Swiss-Prot record:
Belongs to the RdgC family. GO terms for biological process: DNA recombination; regulation of DNA recombination. The keyword Signal does not apply. This is Recombination-associated protein RdgC. It comes from Bordetella pertussis (strain Tohama I / ATCC BAA-589 / NCTC 13251). May be involved in recombination.
């Protein structure tokens, strides 16, 4: 249930859609399985496999985007097209020209696509209409952009802004390391990366290793800045903050994993319980993280 990698955005206006209106918007761009004539297709699927495209609970909305990609190697298309071209050459007495070869490859692609294997990738989206967050569970910017691209088509207009803070994460993390002091309610963990800003981009990394403060200060004095820092919030959630304000490797600690009601809950109740826990904890984490970076910057 817990999102692992957070791409964070702001809702710039109050959420205006009710449940039925949101379902109607999502249905227009629902994933259509079995479309055999496209290399890639995108669409919304049910987060709970219950038919509803949005799972809504106490102002928290969960969506899932499915991306299907056909596996059709260019070498396979070229091999079949080459064989077809030889047949045509025998029939017409001369080799197909460039335009004709292009048409042959297009026909071959159309013939092979229905037989090609597909790979599927699901990306989850959390919309917090209470605290005005929109969070995508994606490690790569390209995947987040894919989601945003379909979201703006699905919900028009979509009240969405990038998140900006007063102090850059790199400057803040560098300051915390130099002072050997984390902001209130946070602690610094054992993974970090410091990187030079010049052409060399030389980097030093601590991986599951206690940070030597004097060593880190020497690197900072030589011009390096912190670009990744492992932290824990409130002894409840661990994560890695990056220079681009991404929050990666999010993990609830043991205190949050203990659910005394789990044994008596059915699947739906457990899902809702996990969703309530995650959205509540991460919303508070994000608010305090933004505060530790000087607050939100209005642009």
């Amino acid at each position: 249930m817990w999102f692992k990698n957070l791409k964070i955005y702001r809702l710039s206006a109050p959420w205006a859609l009710n449940g039925d209106q949101l379902e109607e918007c999502l249905a227009r761009f629902a994933y259509q399985g079995g479309n055999n004539l496209e290399m890639q297709s995108l669409g919304w699927i049910s987060p709970r496999e219950n038919g509803l495209l949005a799972h809504t609970l106490n102002g928290q909305i969960l969506l899932t985007l499915r991306a299907e990609k056909k596996l059709l190697p260019t070498t396979v298309v070229n091999q079949v097209a080459k064989a077809r071209a030889q047949e045509i050459e025998e029939q017409q007495g001369y080799k197909p020209g460039r335009k004709q070869m292009k048409e042959i490859k297009e026909r071959v692609t159309d013939e092979l696509l229905p037989k090609a294997f597909s790979i599927y990738r699901d990306t989850r989206v959390w919309i917090d209409t209470v605290n005005h967050w929109l969070v995508i569970d994606a490690a790569a910017s390209a995947k987040a952009d894919e989601v945003i691209g379909l979201l703006v088509k699905t919900i028009d207009p979509l009240p969405l802004d990038n998140l900006y803070v007063e102090q850059s994460p790199a400057a803040a993390m560098t300051g915390w390391l130099a002072a050997d002091e984390a902001p209130a309610n946070f602690s610094i963990d054992q993974d970090t990366e410091l990187r030079a800003s010049g052409e060399s981009r030389a980097a030093i990394r601590y991986v599951k290793h206690s940070i030597d403060v004097d060593d880190v200060r020497r690197h900072i004095q030589s011009g390096k800045q912190c670009t990744r820092l492992a932290m824990t919030w409130a002894d409840r959630v661990s994560f890695v903050l990056t220079e681009s304000l991404d929050v990666k490797r999010v993990a609830p600690l043991d205190v949050l994993k203990e659910n005394p009601d789990a044994a008596t809950q059915n699947d739906d109740e457990k899902f809702d319980s996990d969703m309530t826990l995650m959205t509540g904890e991460v919303a508070k984490l994000l608010a305090e993280l933004v505060d530790s970076l000087g607050g939100e910057k209005r642009v």
